[in-house]
């Protein structure tokens, strides 16, 4: 039986190249469909694949066809209803066979098509979802770059310590050397052994010639055996080299209001925003730490599960979260070595006397050390004192941004607005 092994990189996905070309060509339509689809998903289903529909008109190809007017004779095979000069009635409702409601304008060609629907994978979905997004003001910390190295494999070397010896590569070199050094002698030995076999069976016996052949065979075998099995020339060691790694370590503080004024719908929208943020960070950057802080009258640093699923609630003192963030930064994240970011989500309801304190903490302690601070207010009500205090900060600090979310449909556009990749001129 003959076996055919497909060793192509795209062996199981032979249309991958065509698929990628299609995604590039219709990226605008696909991204529009994705931005509409994300609002229909549950909080826990944000990162799966998606069925994308594109209007047929957007994917139509240019083609040659007959012009309108003129007289033409056509033959329709299998026709048993009409004869020459009969007139064919126009189909009812325009004859569109597509997915329209049938209440629009009549179709001039009597035909229609459904929208083109196809499935994109999780990776394709996330790539399109977070395309052109980046953490603002992300900088390389140069003084850490001088001291921070990462070890990489760099082939093999003939010198090294015994711990790094490559046994397989050394034995391969040994076999190659012994084969090269003894190949001629082995061919000569094989010829002498064949000659000895012939003489030993010949009549009359040729004792002197047989003795000579035996001596030569013994000498050749001794020469072959004197070739060492392993030599220092054969030894190979795994080679490692240290390459400087630019340090772009970042930490994101997620501050979520869980006070009693935050109803379940508002909390769900806040969680949806933070899930988008988490997926964006984990997919785009290698080493980004996330610090989760929940607050009502008191703030507490929690893990990921408690941040999204805890039912604890209470009053509202926003400054408690800002104070805790300041303490964590001073304790664990030196601003000279870390890119510090923060995303705060709240419904804007805060104890009136606490809002000026929030302004003071941000202006004097946090905003001078963070790369970017974003505030998202989720409410349908009029803005309160916290929003007005933060407006003063936005006018003073370039690294402070604030956005307003009213409904679930606003989450993704607001997210893209906050983390839109900056141009070179803006970042400068």
Curated annotation (Swiss-Prot):
Residues 92-103 have a biased composition (Gly residues). It comes from the Bacteria. InterPro entries: UPF0229. Residues 78-90 have a biased composition (Basic and acidic residues). Residues 78-111 are annotated as: Disordered. Belongs to the UPF0229 family. This is UPF0229 protein YeaH. The lineage of its organism: Bacteria, Pseudomonadati, Pseudomonadota, Gammaproteobacteria, Enterobacterales.
């Amino acid at each position: 039986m003959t076996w055919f092994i497909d060793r192509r990189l795209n062996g199981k996905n032979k249309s991958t190249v065509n698929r990628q070309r299609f995604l590039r060509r219709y990226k605008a339509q696909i991204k529009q469909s994705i931005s509409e689809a994300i609002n229909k998903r549950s909080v826990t289903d944000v990162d799966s694949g998606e069925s994308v529909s594109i209007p047929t008109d957007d994917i139509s190809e240019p083609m040659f066809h007959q012009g309108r007017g003129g007289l033409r004779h056509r033959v329709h095979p299998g026709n048993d209803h009409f004869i020459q000069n009969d007139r064919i009635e126009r189909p009812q409702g325009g004859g569109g066979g597509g997915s329209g409601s049938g209440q629009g304008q009549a179709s001039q060609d009597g035909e229609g098509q459904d929208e083109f629907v196809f499935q994109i994978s999780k990776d394709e979905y996330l790539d399109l979802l977070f395309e052109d997004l980046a953490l603002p003001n992300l900088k390389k910390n140069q003084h850490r770059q001088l001291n921070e190295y990462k070890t990489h494999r760099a082939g093999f070397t003939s010198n090294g310590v015994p711990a790094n010896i490559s046994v397989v590569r050394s034995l391969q070199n040994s076999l190659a050397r012994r084969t090269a050094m003894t190949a001629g002698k082995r061919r000569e030995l094989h010829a002498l052994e064949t000659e000895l076999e012939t003489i030993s069976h010949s009549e009359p016996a040729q004792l002197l010639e047989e003795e000579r052949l035996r001596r030569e065979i013994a000498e050749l075998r001794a020469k072959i055996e004197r070739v060492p099995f392993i030599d220092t020339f054969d030894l190979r060691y795994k080679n490692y080299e240290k390459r400087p790694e630019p340090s772009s370590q970042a930490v994101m503080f997620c501050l979520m209001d869980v006070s009693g004024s935050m109803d379940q719908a508002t909390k769900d929208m806040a969680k949806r925003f933070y899930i988008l943020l988490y997926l964006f960070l984990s997919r785009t950057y290698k080493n980004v730490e996330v610090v989760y802080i929940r607050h009502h009258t008191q703030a507490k640093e929690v893990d990921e599960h408690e941040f999204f699923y805890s039912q604890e609630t209470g009053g509202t003192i926003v400054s408690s979260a800002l104070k805790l963030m300041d303490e964590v930064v001073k304790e664990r994240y030196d601003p000279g070595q870390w890119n510090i970011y923060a995303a705060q989500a709240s419904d804007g309801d805060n104890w009136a006397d606490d809002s000026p304190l929030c302004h003071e903490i941000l202006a004097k302690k946090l905003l001078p050390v963070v790369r970017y601070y974003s505030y998202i207010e989720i409410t349908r009500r009029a803005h309160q004192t916290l929003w007005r205090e933060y407006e003063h900060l936005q006018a003073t600090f370039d690294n402070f941004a604030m956005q307003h979310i009213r409904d679930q449909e606003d989450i993704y556009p607001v997210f893209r607005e906050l983390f839109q990749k900056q141009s070179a001129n803006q970042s400068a």
